[in-house]
Structures are given as C-alpha cells and as structure tokens.
Amino acid sequence: MKKSIFFLLLTTLFFGFSPLECQAQEGAILLEKDHSLHSNFHKFALSRINTINRNFLHTPENMFIEGNGSVYVGRYHKVDHSSVVVEVKQINSNTAPFIGVIQYVESVFESNGQCNISAAEGPFNPVRHRKVTEIFRYVQNRWQ
C-alpha cells in the first residue's frame, strides 16, 4: 500500500498529473501522424534512440568478448530504428496538455567463434529482446 501511494505522489510531482488522472482520461485524443507536434515528437524519439544506442556499454564498435579457450562469444546491445513506435496524445491537463509515448525493442546480439577475432567479425544474431515503453510530457514547447 505504501509503495502505491509513494508511486502516485512521485508521478504526480514528476509529470504534473497522476496516473489516476490519466486513467480517468480514457478518451484522450490521439493526434494524427501529419500533425506538427507528432512529427516534432517523432524527431525527438529518433534522437533519443540514437542517444540510447550511443550510450550502451557494449555497442557494435565496442563489443564484449568472452571466451573459455575453445569458444568465444561477441556480444552487443542495439535498438533497431524499425522497432520504434510513437504516439502523441492530447490529455486534459493544464501543466502538460500532451504526452508522447515511445515504444521500442532493445536487442542483444551474439556471435560465436573459435577465437576473439572471429567472434567479433560475426555473423551476429539476436538472442534476447526487451520491449521498452517511455512516456514524455510536452511542457513549455518541448518534450521532457
């Protein structure tokens, strides 16, 4: 019970509206893809995905390679731009009239080889996926 009250308070302070307020607004208006705010959020989302890909600890340029002498594994993380889905919704809030939702898939790619060089050269195959959803609010003419 204390965790749910804390979560409600935290989200109310951070986003300017409570999750209960969002749930009450099931009739939130989904903006069309040709709306200028939607295209603005789409650019923001792609920039965010580029930042996420750049900030992974293990990237295609800096992959993790481990081995036990006979088999080596090269591994890195990446968000595929084709997995990105964005939505912009108009809500009834004075502080944040719009929210943007980004959904994407983080994938872990691995390659096996007989030495660290062959493991680093690939071919790489996706071995794990994680679906991520991020919610942003539009305040003072920018996405936060």
Regions found by a protein language model. Give the residues of each.
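Small/flexible residues
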Residues: S4-I5, H77-D80, V132
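Flexible low-complexity loop/turn motifs enriched in small/helix-breaking residues
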Residues: C22-I117, E121-G122, P126-R128
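Bacterial N-terminal signal peptides that target proteins for export
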Residues: M1-L9
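Generic structural motif
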Residues: S4, S107-F109, V139-N141
